[in-house]
């Protein structure tokens, strides 16, 4: 039996992850082991990622992560983000973030009251390098100057770019686009683009590249230009949040953090302390992350069933307030669960 280490974290992480676990347990048999992490954990134990949680994560085959609240800058000395620590610790170098409106973009635009959404059907996958870039956390103060090191390695670039091409081919995608700022960041992004241009020659699939600033505009104006995007850590973080607006917001944005030996699944959204405890957080991103989990373990039909259930809820406006509905977090989880149960019974 596969072991899943569940780390709910802070805020709405504690509300959406239980809904995801309901779906996980309905569709498979897993041993659930729970760990703690985040700001509450820091206040309780003096450590945002206790050793006990690390050991449980090591023991598990898969990690399911909620969301964490970070302390304010300067509030905690030498603070290290638990999620970034886990990504580095387990070499989870590929962050896969699907941006998909299930072919019902116009409907989502109406129910979510996003006026700029139209009938365009969005199906983009952003693949973000997950262990390098500015997120290595090498920052320092020299007198009155703050300095951050941006680390881009050939090994890290090759690894994520090959992953993107392999992902595209395996999933019958049509194109891989490299997003960079090599015209200014000539050494760091220059290396990333150089590696992309070397590797693309070995794959029989369309490949191109765009500057990150023009990409930010074209994601909104011409999202149909993009299929699979591969990019560096910070650009991927920013662009995927921006792109989520095309599909109704972060409440519909799942993600997978994949390494050679382990994977971690999490919603893209944060802990949302402004709505925590109100029971109105959208659990769909967490539940869609479970769909990605089933894809990862080779049970794509279960992942597809989850996505079908989410689409059903969107079409029938069985959604939380962020998407224009009036259901509670638990209600949406129950609606998705009931749809899955009916389908499994042949209804």
From Swiss-Prot:
SMART domains, A to Z: Iso_dh (SM01329)
Pathway, per record: Organic acid metabolism; 2-oxosuberate biosynthesis
A Pfam family this chain is assigned to: Iso_dh
InterPro entries listed in its UniProt record: HICDH (IPR054960), IsoCit/isopropylmalate_DH_CS (IPR019818), IsoPropMal-DH-like_dom (IPR024084), LEU3_arc (IPR011828)
Named cofactor requirement(s): Mg(2+)
GO process terms (BP): coenzyme B biosynthetic process; isocitrate metabolic process; L-leucine biosynthetic process
Keywords of the record: Magnesium, Metal-binding, NAD, Oxidoreductase, Phosphoprotein
Keyword Ribosomal protein: no
Source taxon at top rank: Archaea
Thermal activity characteristics from the UniProt entry: Stable at 100 degrees Celsius for 10 min.
Residues the record lists as Phosphoserine modifications: 81
Reactions catalysed: (2R,3S)-homoisocitrate + NAD(+) = 2-oxoadipate + CO2 + NADH; (2R,3S)-iso(homo)2citrate + NAD(+) = 2-oxoheptanedioate + CO2 + NADH; (2R,3S)-iso(homo)3citrate + NAD(+) = 2-oxosuberate + CO2 + NADH
Molecular function terms, GO-annotated: 3-isopropylmalate dehydrogenase activity; homoisocitrate dehydrogenase activity; isocitrate dehydrogenase (NAD+) activity; magnesium ion binding; NAD binding
Positions contributing to (2R,3S)-homoisocitrate binding: 70, 87, 97, 128, 135, 181, 183
Cofactor binding summary note: Binds 1 Mg(2+) ion per subunit.
Chain positions recorded as Mg(2+) binding sites: 213, 237, 241
Function of the protein: Catalyzes the NAD-dependent oxidation and decarboxylation of (2R,3S)-homoisocitrate, (2R,3S)-homo(2)-isocitrate and (2R,3S)-homo(3)-isocitrate, into 2-oxoadipate, 2-oxopimelate (2-oxoheptanedioate), and 2-oxosuberate, respectively. All these substrates are intermediates in the biosynthesis of biotin and of 7-mercaptoheptanoate, a moiety of coenzyme B in methanoarchaea. Is also able to produce 2-oxoazelate from (2R,3S)-homo(4)-isocitrate in vitro, but this substrate is probably not physiologically relevant.
UniProt name for this protein: Homoisocitrate dehydrogenase
Species whose genome carries this gene: Methanocaldococcus jannaschii (strain ATCC 43067 / DSM 2661 / JAL-1 / JCM 10045 / NBRC 100440)
Phylogenetic lineage: Archaea, Methanobacteriati, Methanobacteriota, Methanomada group, Methanococci
Gene: aksF
């Amino acid at each position: 039996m596969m072991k899943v280490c569940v780390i709910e974290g802070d805020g709405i992480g504690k509300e959406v992850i239980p809904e995801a676990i309901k779906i996980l347990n309905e569709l498979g048999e897993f041993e659930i082991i729970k760990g703690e992490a985040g700001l509450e954990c820091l206040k309780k134990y003096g450590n945002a990622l206790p050793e006990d949680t690390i050991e449980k994560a090591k023991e598990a085959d898969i990690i399911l992560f909620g969301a964490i609240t970070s302390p304010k800058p300067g509030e905690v000395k030498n603070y290290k983000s638990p999620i970034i620590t886990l990504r580095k610790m387990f070499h989870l170098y590929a962050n896969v973030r699907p941006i998909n409106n299930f072919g019902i973009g116009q409907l989502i635009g109406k129910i979510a009251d996003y006026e700029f959404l139209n009938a365009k059907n969005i199906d983009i996958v952003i693949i973000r390098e997950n262990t390098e870039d500015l997120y290595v956390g090498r920052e320092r103060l020299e007198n009155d100057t703050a300095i951050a090191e941006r680390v881009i390695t050939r090994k890290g670039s090759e690894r994520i770019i090959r992953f993107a091409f392999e992902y595209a081919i395996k999933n019958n995608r049509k194109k891989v686009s490299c997003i960079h700022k090599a015209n200014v960041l000539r050494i760091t992004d220059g290396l990333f683009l150089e590696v992309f241009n070397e590797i693309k020659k070995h794959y029989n699939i369309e490949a191109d590249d765009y500057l990150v600033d023009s990409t930010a505009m074209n994601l909104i104006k011409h999202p149909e230009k993009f299929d699979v995007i591969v990019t560096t850590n910070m650009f991927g973080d920013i662009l995927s949040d921006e792109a989520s607006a095309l599909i109704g917001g972060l409440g519909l944005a799942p993600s997978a953090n994949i390494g050679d030996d382990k994977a971690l699944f999490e919603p893209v959204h944060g802990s949302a302390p402004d709505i925590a405890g109100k029971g109105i957080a959208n659990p769909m991103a967490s539940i869609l992350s479970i769909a990605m989990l089933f894809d990862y373990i080779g049970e794509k039909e279960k992942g597809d069933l989850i996505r079908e259930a989410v689409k059903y809820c969107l079409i029938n406006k069985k959604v939380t307030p962020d998407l224009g509905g009036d259901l509670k977090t638990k209600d949406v989880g129950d609606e998705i669960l009931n749809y899955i149960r009916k389908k499994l019974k042949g209804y």
